[in-house]
Amino acid sequence: MVHEPSPLQGTLRLFQTEPISLPYFETNAQHPNKLIFIPGLTDTMGVVPYLPSLASVLNDLEYSLIQFVKCSDLGGFGTSSLEGDAQEIAQLAEHLLTRSDSPCTGKLVLMGHSTGCQDVVTFLSEERLNLKTGQQILVHGGICQAPVSDSEYFDSHDGSQNSARELLSKSQECVKKGLPGALLDRSHISPVRTSLKGRGEGNSATVLTPAF
């Protein structure tokens, strides 16, 4: 039996409009403390099942829960970088600290889930400037929940497959040649063409089998 996910109530808005518009969702925006949640590989806003419970606990502690969309979400893995994620998190943090209504005046915390923990470590590995104030973005804490790296995920899920190992070898060769942004052949991913009364699995294959 599939249980319907618990709903979350809050505010949906944009934290940036250039060079691409990116949204975020916040529960209990009136609280001075903010926790930015960063999900793992192929996940995006609202996917992780314990978020309603987390939001409830955070509310008691006068924290709002913030989920956001970044360019590497869903099928963006393999075409993005951890530093790129960190820069988008910095843009979100700057917005939360400087927005006119209910800004972050208390503590700002990052929480990574699974491979999202890599973004927490990358963000905290160097200073991040608040371009609106000229000061360093101050983060009061970083939480790593069930941490795992991309390579560990690969080894536990795809590493035993010959096709995956072949693609990994090709990707390493591209890096050696100075082509870290090169895309590998994705012909092994069969496009979903079947349809029953206009319904099917959509583009889920590109998310469930992301680029290496």
Please provide the spans of the model-predicted regions.
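Gly/Ala-rich beta-loop-alpha elbow adjacent to hydrolase catalytic centers
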Residues: 111-120
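Active-site signature of alpha/beta-hydrolase-fold catalytic machinery across serine-
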Residues: 122-126
